[in-house]
Swiss-Prot record:
It catalyses: adenosine(37) in tRNA1(Val) + S-adenosyl-L-methionine = N(6)-methyladenosine(37) in tRNA1(Val) + S-adenosyl-L-homocysteine + H(+). It is an enzyme of class 2 (transferase). Its EC number is 2.1.1.223. GO terms for biological process: methylation; tRNA processing. Signal peptide: none annotated. This is tRNA1(Val) (adenine(37)-N6)-methyltransferase. PROSITE patterns: N6_MTASE. One of its GO terms (molecular function) is nucleic acid binding. The gene is yfiC. CDD domains: AdoMet_MTases. Gene3D superfamilies: Vaccinia Virus protein VP39.
Length: 245
């Protein structure tokens, strides 16, 4: 490995089929995003949208999981993060399939005629709190730039009738998000509560909504077993991505 490559790989996350540099992004690649990217239903999708793309992690994961005919649009408001996402995509096997847009999602969706079978987002979820060190991190953590009602509205404007809109959120915020989504006409179709181990309460929730009514399937995912190694279920979900699984 060359010295420059070694330096690059300390600034990001190496997966089996791609590398995500994230040193210029406010929010880094982590378990939440990896869970969402591996969990979101991709069967039969033709076009995907990643709202708040950050480093491009979710778009890259979806590209790995879908056929070569699937097109993925990734929209990111912060210019430095969008540039890094573009660089990550350019170094991946899926340059021709992923389009990164530096844009405000509220403005971007009004210009689109295409509809998406799958929309995915790892959204900001804090309404207020301690001031962050940078405006970029504040934007990534707090809902001031993209509140949940606006996010749901934007997704509704560009999703297909049978499409899925998927998010990952802290458990309690996910419950509030679900109530809001239902009040806006969305239908909850998939829910996975995520706990660190069997002894702990769920701390994250994966949610999939659709404009179309249907049965809701719910389950629970435990990340680590009694031996503190990754559980069989978590391994099965993510082993296509983690380098050493």
């Amino acid at each position: 490995m060359s010295q420059s490559t070694s330096v690059l790989r300390r600034n990001g996350f190496t997966f089996k089929q791609f590398f995500v540099a994230h040193d210029r992004c406010a929010m880094k690649a982590g378990t939440d995003g990896i869970l969402l990217g591996a969990w979101a239903p991709v069967a039969g999708v033709k076009r995907c949208l990643d709202i708040g793309a950050g480093s491009g992690l979710l778009a890259l994961m979806l590209a790995q999981r879908t056929s070569d005919s699937v097109i993925i649009d990734a929209v990111e408001l912060e210019s430095e993060a969008a540039t890094q996402a573009q660089e990550n995509v350019a170094q991946s096997p899926w340059l021709e399939r992923i389009n990164v847009h530096t844009a405000d999602i509220q403005q971007w969706v009004t210009q689109q005629t295409a509809r998406f079978d799958l929309i995915i987002s790892n959204p900001p979820y804090y309404e207020q709190g301690v001031e962050c060190a940078t405006p970029q991190r504040e934007q990534a953590r707090y809902t001031t730039s993209l509140d949940h009602q606006t996010l749901l509205t934007c997704a509704a404007e560009c999703i297909t009738e049978e499409g899925f809109f998927c998010v990952v959120l802290p458990e309690q915020i996910g419950n509030s998000f679900t109530e809001l989504a239902l009040s806006m006409g969305w239908h909850l179709r998939l829910r996975t509560d995520v706990a660190e181990n069997e002894a702990r309460l769920p701390h994250r929730v994966l949610l999939a909504f659709s404009p179309q009514a249907g049965e809701c399937f719910s389950d629970r995912l435990v990340i680590r077993g009694p031996d503190q190694n990754y559980s069989e279920a978590y391994t099965a979900l993510t082993q296509a991505f983690y380098l050493f699984m």
